């Protein structure tokens, strides 16, 4: 059978030691992360360790919570001729944000914005977003996406903090902002009879 260990109570050094021990014994190791490991994960230092010790590894892509949010909201996050950019970011909490990536600067584009790890600083998030998004911009607070107790709360940007606080939403909440939420307008040119492409000319 498999040996299963939770990394929640382990330091990075303890994780490395355990993985190397099993690797040196010729055993197969799976380091399982939530979501997709390339987004707000901790795989960079793990890859550096594997590289340093010549350990072969393979990364299997996962499904990020922002993708689960789009599915739960039954929304396409890019809308033809209206929104063509999705921003994945977070508010500034204990880990400082680079100056050029402050939330209010990113908000200038009024793109679809998916905000991770920021329910605890929702007042600050709302304040920064409202510097550029209209107060009535659609928002969604998506709690425990893909879990059995998943909950979705829709509203307007001006009520975002109220929505999060009144429903006691925690760190595992994805905040989505933008006109793409619930949008049913705009047609893709992909299937237009006037549009020629590789498979139809």
Which functions belong to the PLM regions below?
Residues 14, 24-29, 48, 83-85, ...:
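A contiguous loop/helix-start segment that scaffolds small-molecule binding in enzyme catalytic cores
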Residues 36-109, 151-154:
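Class I SAM-dependent methyltransferase SAM-binding "motif I" and its flanking Rossmann-like core
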Residues 1-60:
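Class I S-adenosyl-L-methionine
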Residues 1, 51-54, 77, 131-136:
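A short alpha->loop->secondary-structure connector
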Residues 7-9, 90-91, 144:
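Active-site donor-binding loop signature of nucleotide-sugar glycosyltransferases
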């Amino acid at each position: 059978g498999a040996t299963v260990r939770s990394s929640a109570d382990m330091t990075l050094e303890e994780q490395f030691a355990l993985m190397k021990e099993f690797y040196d014994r010729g055993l197969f190791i799976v380091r399982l992360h939530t979501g997709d490991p390339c987004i707000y994960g901790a795989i960079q230092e793990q890859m550096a360790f594997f590289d340093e010790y010549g350990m072969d590894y393979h990364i299997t892509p996962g499904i990020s919570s922002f993708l689960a949010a789009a599915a739960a909201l039954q929304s396409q996050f890019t809308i033809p001729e209206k929104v063509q950019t999705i921003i994945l970011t977070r508010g500034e909490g204990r880990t400082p944000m680079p100056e050029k990536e402050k939330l209010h600067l990113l908000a200038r584009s009024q793109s679809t914005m998916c905000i991770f790890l920021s329910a605890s600083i929702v007042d600050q998030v709302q304040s920064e977003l409202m510097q550029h998004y209209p107060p009535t911009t659609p928002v969604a607070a998506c709690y425990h996406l893909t879990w059995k107790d998943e909950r979705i709360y829709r509203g307007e940007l001006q009520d975002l903090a109220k929505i999060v606080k009144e429903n006691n939403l925690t760190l595992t909440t994805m905040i989505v902002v933008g006109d793409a939420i619930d949008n049913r307008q705009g047609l893709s040119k992909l299937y237009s009879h006037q549009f020629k492409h590789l498979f139809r000319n």
